UniProtKB/Swiss-Prot annotation:
PANTHER family xrefs: F-BOX_WD REPEAT-CONTAINING PROTEIN 7, PHOSPHOLIPASE A-2-ACTIVATING PROTEIN
Molecular function in Gene Ontology: cyclin binding; identical protein binding; phosphothreonine residue binding; protein-macromolecule adaptor activity; ubiquitin binding; ubiquitin protein ligase binding; ubiquitin-like ligase-substrate adaptor activity; ubiquitin-protein transferase activator activity
Implicated disorder: Developmental delay, hypotonia, and impaired language: An autosomal dominant neurodevelopmental disorder characterized by global developmental delay, borderline to severe intellectual disability, language difficulties, hypotonia, and gastrointestinal problems. Brain imaging shows variable structural abnormalities affecting the cerebellum, corpus collosum, and white matter.
Biased composition (Polar residues): 69-84
Species whose genome carries this gene: Homo sapiens (Human)
Variant or mutagenesis effect after changing residue 117 to K: In a breast cancer sample; somatic mutation
Name of the protein this chain belongs to: F-box/WD repeat-containing protein 7
């Protein structure tokens, strides 16, 4: 009989097996199936007998076994079919199902409330990858469903039976592959799964569906949706089912599915499908699971956190996010006051908050709304010659002989530092200490909190044009062609460095060596302790205006249009960087990347290890006049110009992003003299030389929620 059933099943599979589509469990397909049930319920009851009669007719030609086993088996199948139909029509079963749905709805509301914050965080990241995956999934389902009807005869394509079964039937996947993990928010367990006895582990390969449930930590016994009494003969039919071979069981299941209504098929899908969604992460030790998640990009990690509660706990791991922050150069966690009480089991990650905040800040720099900046008015119509910005404190120096201390938060002038008898042309700041150099040939050390002048440093015989502060010492360069090393705590001059024959224009100090550039075309490297010149770097053919020093390389910019890279140990010139057409007025060096601004209105990005020009910031949006100041970080380059604009560029691509500041008087006298930027704020010193723009500071804040 088994072989005969197999032959009949093969025949049915050739004629009707391909009718089985692959209905999705999505909401659209569920509504479609429910609509079919509601509209055709009466018609299905009438067609039920016709379908059974048609199936019985196909088996008529099969030779029955002795003892009427064929008739008995057919009766049991009909009895079980009627039992599945009666379950869906049972009112008490529907009522219990409704109560269970209400209970799950309450649990879902609570879970949604817990995950609301995670959803908001994820929405801040680009969702294009998810959209493309959904499109690909939709296309794959469409191709699969289309291919399943290629070999159908014409009369079956047009039959009502085909229309009905393609909506309600699902072809079983008997392969060994496990379903891919879904994107839904489904709770998953984490434990060392054991068998129902609790004594021995489950087998590595589950042999029954109950074993599979046990392997998933859910127990072999499912919670039933109805309390109706089992039909007569059910246990005998199950015993007979267990006695059949694997192919015979598959054939019986196919026959059973053919006789089910859409709601019954839907129930089977809801029971079976989740068991093949194995959560491999929850089966791993926590340390190994975190190691796996560490390979995800931050935006993908936020998406993974929405998969289930256990994944969310893993995705909140503070050390995991600390590594992500380290990769992005974020060196401090973010400690904020929580408005919501965190439920047990969920630990807030300060490092994750810091990463999300930094992502929001970067987005605001790129495309956030440019709200009206804070305007800090001062120094009347004088030129702001130097600008410092540290923490929440801004210090501006002017040729009106004063310095002003401002709050970057409120925009208020906290105090005015009065004492110089000439214009202030250089300054440095660290913590609460401010140092200024003036045309009155002195340096002054100020207390930023009180405005008190702590020391006045005498020694230079001309304007103090440049200085560099390192810890407790400051090195000053003067138009008297000398450099002096000072102790800012005692006010004493420790060393005098003499050797230049013209005004010193720029200086750098790393605590061990002093590097100076002067109008005598020379760059000198000094040992301040012995007051000796270690190297004189010769090569420029005009005045040296700018310097950078990272402890290994010296980079000098000159009026001769060239930039030279030197080895500080040997004094050799490693590279000569050419491309600019005029004076290199400003440079910044970080991690072998040099950004130079020039009076020819261009900005260039260089690799000083190779001497290669990586990018030239120009094009239709380039500056229209000399570049006055610049600053860069790992993502952006910020430049200011005599044309009255401040521009933002992409460091890696060199592409223009947008204008951050555009003066109305730009092009007719309005100038941006200096800029200083932190991670979250931009400070610009603006004014004019012809009275068209009032002297002031502009403060833009990018650490705000632009939504």
């Amino acid at each position: 009989m088994n072989q005969e059933l197999l032959s009949v099943g093969s025949k049915r599979r050739r004629t009707g097996g391909s009718l089985r589509g692959n209905p999705s469990s999505s909401q659209v397909d569920e509504e479609q199936m429910n609509r079919v049930v509601e509209e055709e319920q009466q018609q299905q009851l009438r067609q039920q007998e016709e379908e059974h009669t048609a199936r019985n007719g196909e088996v008529v030609g099969v030779e029955p076994r002795p003892g009427g086993q064929n008739d008995s088996q057919q009766g049991q199948l009909e009895e079980n079919n009627n039992r599945f139909i009666s379950v869906d029509e049972d009112s008490s079963g529907n009522q219990e199902e409704q109560e269970e749905d209400e209970e799950h709805a309450g649990e879902q509301d609570e879970e949604d409330e817990e995950e609301e914050e995670m959803d908001q965080e994820s929405d801040d990241f680009d969702q294009s990858d998810d959209s493309s995956r959904e499109d690909e999934h939709t296309h794959t389902n469409s191709v699969t469903n289309s291919s399943s009807i290629v070999d159908l005869p014409v009369h079956q394509l047009s039959s009502p039976f085909y229309t009905k079964t393609t909506k309600m039937k699902r072809k079983l996947d008997h392969g060994s592959e496990v379903r891919s993990f879904s994107l839904g928010k489904k709770p998953c367990k984490v434990s060392e799964y054991t068998s129902t006895t609790g004594l021995v582990p489950c087998s590595a390969t589950p042999t029954t569906f109950g074993d599979l449930r046990a392997a998933n930590g859910q127990g072999q016994q499912r919670r039933r949706i109805t309390s109706v009494q089992p039909p007569t003969g059910l246990q005998e039919w199950l015993k007979m089912f267990q006695s059949w071979s694997g192919p015979e069981k598959l054939l019986a299941l196919d026959e059973l599915i053919d006789s089910c209504e859409p709601t019954q098929v839907k129930h089977m899908m809801q029971v079976i499908e989740p068991q093949f969604q194995r959560d491999f992460i929850s089966l791993l030790p926590k340390e190994l699971a975190l190691y796996v998640l560490s390979f995800l990009e931050p935006k993908d990690l936020l998406q993974a956190a929405q998969t289930c509660r256990y994944w969310r706990i893993l995705a909140e791991d503070n050390l995991l996010w600390r590594e992500k922050c380290k990769e992005e150069g974020i060196d401090e966690p973010l400690h904020i006051k929580r408005r919501k009480v965190i439920k047990p089991g969920f630990i807030h990650s300060p490092w994750k908050s810091a990463y999300i905040r930094q992502h929001r800040i970067d987005t605001n720099w790129r495309r956030g709304e440019l709200k009206s900046p804070k305007v800090l008015k001062g120094h009347d119509d004088h030129v702001i010659t130097c600008l410092q910005f540290c923490g929440n404190r801004i210090v501006s120096g002017s040729d009106d002989n004063t310095l002003k201390v401002w709050s970057a938060v409120t925009g208020k002038c906290l105090r005015t530092l009065v004492g110089h008898t000439g214009g202030v042309w250089s300054s440095q700041m660290r913590d609460n200490i401010i140092i200024s150099g003036s045309t009155d040939r002195t340096l002054k050390v100020w207390n930023a909190e009180t405005g008190e002048c702590i020391h006045t440093l005498y020694g230079h015989t001309s304007t103090v044009r440049c200085m560099h502060l390192h810890e407790k010492r400051v090195v000053s360069g003067s138009r008297d062609a000398t450099l002096r090393v000072w102790d800012i705590e005692t006010g004493q001059c420790l060393h005098v460095l003499m050797g230049h024959v013209a005004a010193v224009r720029c200086v750098q100090y790393d605590g061990r060596r002093v590097v100076s550039g002067a109008y005598d075309f020379m760059v000198k490297v000094w040992d301040p302790e012995t007051e000796t010149c270690l190297h004189t770097l010769q090569g420029h053919t005009n005045r040296v205006y700018s310097l950078q020093f990272d402890g290994i390389h010296v980079v000098s910019g000159s009026l001769d249009t060239s930039i030279r890279v030197w080895d500080v140990e040997t004094g050799n010139c490693i590279h000569t960087l050419t491309g600019h057409q005029s004076l290199t007025s400003g440079m910044e060096l970080k991690d072998n990347i040099l950004v130079s601004g020039n009076a020819d209105s261009t900005v260039k990005i260089w690799d000083i290890k190779t001497g290669q020009c990586l990018q030239t910031l120009q094009g239709p949006n380039k500056h229209q006049s000399a570049v006055t100041c610049l600053q860069f970080n790992k993502n952006f380059v910020i430049t200011s110009s005599d044309d009255g604009t401040v521009k933002l560029w992409d460091l890696k691509t060199g592409e223009f992003i947008r204008n951050l500041v555009t003066l109305e008087s730009g092009g007719s006298g309005g100038v941006v003299w200096r800029i200083r930027a932190s991670n979250t704020k931009l400070v610009c010193a603006v004014g004019s030389r012809n009275g068209t723009e009032e002297t002031k500071l502009l403060v833009l804040d990018f650490d705000v929620d632009m939504k």
